[in-house]
Amino acid sequence: MSKKSVAQLSAADLEGKRVLVRVDFNVPVDEKGVITDETRIRAALPTIQDLISKGAKVILVSHFGRPKGVDEKLRLTPVAQRLSELLHKPVAKLDDCIGDAVIAHTQAMANGDVCLLENVRFHPGEEKNDPEFAKQLAACAEVYVNDAFGTAHRAHASTAGVTQYLSPCVAGFLMEKELEYLQNAIEHPRRPLAAIVGGSKVSSKIGVIEALLEKVDKLLIGGGMIFTFYKARGLNVGKSLVEEDKLELAKHLETKAQEKGVELLLPTDVVVADNFANDANSQVVSIEAIPDDWMGLDIGPASVKRFQEALQDCKTVIWNGPMGVFEFDQFAKGTEAIARYLAELTSQGVCTIIGGGDSVAAVEKVGVADRMSHISTGGGASLELLEGKQLPGIAALDDA
């Protein structure tokens, strides 16, 4: 499923062309509207700079937050200001993303100019993938580049609908890197291939666990979902989080792992607390000895060691989801130890892929983000790609 990339378009293909680039500028801001993490803006720079250098007229489009109609707090003005500083050139922020004023501005652009359209989610037609809205959005451009992997699993006007009206439609550098790492890890991995799946609920990771059992050599499970597996085995889990309606499923997944010859590892010890708080009393216990009124909030030190030993000979490791409640420092040790160990494995030539969401926050918190092979920018999108699903935003691009 390899897709055509912006790298394959030359200056001759792009010079003087108006290029609509779907980026992901959905950055976190504080109550004053100041950007607190500009990672997503920086991640889009290689594609934007490449288009500028090839003489294109760059028209950026993104969503920001979840507005219901126009919301003054969710205008993209601060993003345009920061982008302008990073690019060392002016970035015009337009007042809308469709309409005559937008078309007039984009037609008057010089080669190498950059503008940012207003928050595309101010229009309900974006999330509905309304063909009429998609047509109006595409009217300002000729070529389409999608560099927003984080929204590739959504069939929206700016990720899928506009491709009906623009050509060529290609992947940006960020999108290309995501596809290269995630698809290779699943389709042509260097083995042994291990996946570490964490998070609190089995229900949100069923699809990915089922799909991974078809592909991996080892599956390590941590996070709150382990207690559903323990309860299914008949163990007492105290007040730990359990999805009662998923007990049969947990049994099925363990059986499936055996049938497929996949080594499925669950923690052997856990850190339990007497309540859900950072300052709770805690102790390390074996999974057979969880006290009645206590709840498990992290994997224990023996499990960390066991997980590290299991990963030692692996050549590819995919990690999605924390090992415990890592927002509380007291219960972050399991997650942090795994993050550090993966950084160590990367330095020994192992391909390590951090698949979106909380695991990205975890490796950033530990300060080892730059030591991983690849950090996925899309939470839901990377999960769906690992599940083997077709993502609308990727399917809509031209094949290589």
Curated annotation (Swiss-Prot):
Known catalysed reaction(s)? (2R)-3-phosphoglycerate + ATP = (2R)-3-phospho-glyceroyl phosphate + ADP
Q: Which CDD domains match?
A: Phosphoglycerate_kinase
Which PANTHER family does this UniProt record tie to the protein? Answer: PHOSPHOGLYCERATE KINASE, PHOSPHOGLYCERATE KINASE 1, CHLOROPLASTIC-RELATED
Q: What is this protein called?
A: Phosphoglycerate kinase
The residues that hold ATP are: K205, G296, E327, G356, G357, D358, S359
What does the entry give for GO biological process? gluconeogenesis; glycolytic process
Q: How is the quaternary structure described?
A: Monomer.
PROSITE patterns (UniProt xref):
PGLYCERATE_KINASE
**What EC identifiers does the entry list?**
2.7.2.3
| Superkingdom, taxonomy of origin | Bacteria
**Subcellular location field:** Cytoplasm
* Gene name of the encoded protein: pgk
Question: Pfam families of this UniProt entry?
Answer: PGK
Q: What are the transmembrane regions? A: none
Predominant cellular place of this UniProt entry's protein: cytoplasm
Task: Give the species.
Answer: Thermosynechococcus vestitus (strain NIES-2133 / IAM M-273 / BP-1)
